[in-house]
């Protein structure tokens, strides 16, 4: 069993009903998806069932990023990186749907980073957090 690291503000999404509700909030098929903090990949796997065009996973925890490689899917690209330093705009020329079970300890910083740049750059179409 994988334990959440408090130092990284981790919390893992495991309730299948909540995962279903989250995934059903926006159309996923043929869209590009960025998932922030995919953790154990429960939400990732459900999103993949809905056939996104491409899926980008940004996971800071090296152990979890490595374990996500078990999701053997050509549409998935895994980045073992810190979302606060990550350049989301470099992923695609298209707008991306963002899913995230954000780490509690940096959620304000993440949102501030994204919202600050909204005036000049609309790199995402939806935020499902």
Describe the function of each predicted region:
Residues 1-129:
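Catalytic cores of RNA-modifying enzymes
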């Amino acid at each position: 069993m994988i334990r959440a690291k408090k130092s990284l503000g981790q919390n893992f999404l495991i309730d299948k009903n909540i995962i279903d509700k989250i995934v059903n909030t926006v159309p996923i098929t043929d869209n590009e998806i960025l998932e922030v903090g995919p953790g154990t990949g429960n939400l990732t796997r459900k999103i993949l069932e809905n056939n996104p065009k491409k899926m980008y996973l940004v996971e800071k925890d090296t152990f979890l990023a490595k374990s996500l490689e078990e999701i053997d899917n050509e549409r998935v690209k895994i980045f073992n990186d810190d979302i606060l330093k990550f350049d989301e705009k470099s992923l695609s020329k298209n707008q991306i749907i963002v899913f995230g079970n954000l780490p509690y300890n940096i959620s304000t910083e993440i949102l501030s980073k994204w919202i600050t740049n909204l005036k000049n750059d609309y790199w995402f179409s939806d935020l499902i957090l």
